């Protein structure tokens, strides 16, 4: 890790420690046990792809370190409904506050607004966050290989499995991809954004796709703006896509989502 990602993860560890002090793990686990069952994030994507359509993970994101404020009129329930109306298969909701202006309530309100499975998009550095994610109603969590050691990634994934959560493991280069393949999850995302520099190049997915085994579901992430971009990614085997900023900037999010998937 270096630069942006290191800073984010260092801050996240400090935040998690503060949350642990404010609310012990046992209390969070009680909430997680009383939450509605997880909704089958991977199952929904498989069903969509098997039906001959692209599986879109549509992201609810207010801001980012690279672009600042993305959508001033930010209402997660309305956005969730717009994405669902536009044909999204799943949602991704940013809950990181310091860098993305997210919060837990955004996930709660989006989850309550629609019946789509939801990914908690955050920087997972501690198993405490996994129980927290289940308590919030998340169906899937993110593992960023650039942010974790192999042992930490396994620990986070094992915690997710124990809580019935699916896992999207994210990589940006061949070394991270090889490490990610040691995990159990079939859902493998290639982030076209380098989280250390924030630079974007959609050729990243093209370069790594050939090394993704056939039993993994390839998800192309970041830098996708048009049906042509999705077709370019599909040509190398991606049938699932995580798209946020390009849709969040549109006045009519539902229409933009339909157009992207056309």
UniProtKB/Swiss-Prot annotation:
UniProt-listed Enzyme Commission number(s): 4.1.1.48
Catalytic function, reaction form: 1-(2-carboxyphenylamino)-1-deoxy-D-ribulose 5-phosphate + H(+) = (1S,2R)-1-C-(indol-3-yl)glycerol 3-phosphate + CO2 + H2O
Top-level enzyme category: lyase
UniProtKB keywords: Amino-acid biosynthesis, Aromatic amino acid biosynthesis, Decarboxylase, Lyase, Tryptophan biosynthesis
GO MF annotations in UniProt: indole-3-glycerol-phosphate synthase activity; phosphoribosylanthranilate isomerase activity
Disulfide bond annotation, renumbered to this chain: none
Pfam family, one: IGPS
Pathway assigned in UniProt: Amino-acid biosynthesis; L-tryptophan biosynthesis; L-tryptophan from chorismate: step 4/5
Gene3D superfamilies in UniProt: Aldolase class I
Single GO BP term: L-tryptophan biosynthetic process
Function according to Swiss-Prot or TrEMBL: Participates in the tryptophan-dependent indole-3-acetic acid production, which is a phytohormone released by A.brasilense.
NCBIfam families, sorted: PRK00278.1-2 (NF001370), PRK00278.1-6 (NF001373), PRK00278.2-4 (NF001377)
Family of the protein in this entry: Belongs to the TrpC family.
Family matches, as HAMAP family: IGPS_B (MF_00134_B)
Identification of the protein by name: Indole-3-glycerol phosphate synthase
Organism name: Azospirillum brasilense
Lineage of the organism: Bacteria, Pseudomonadati, Pseudomonadota, Alphaproteobacteria, Rhodospirillales
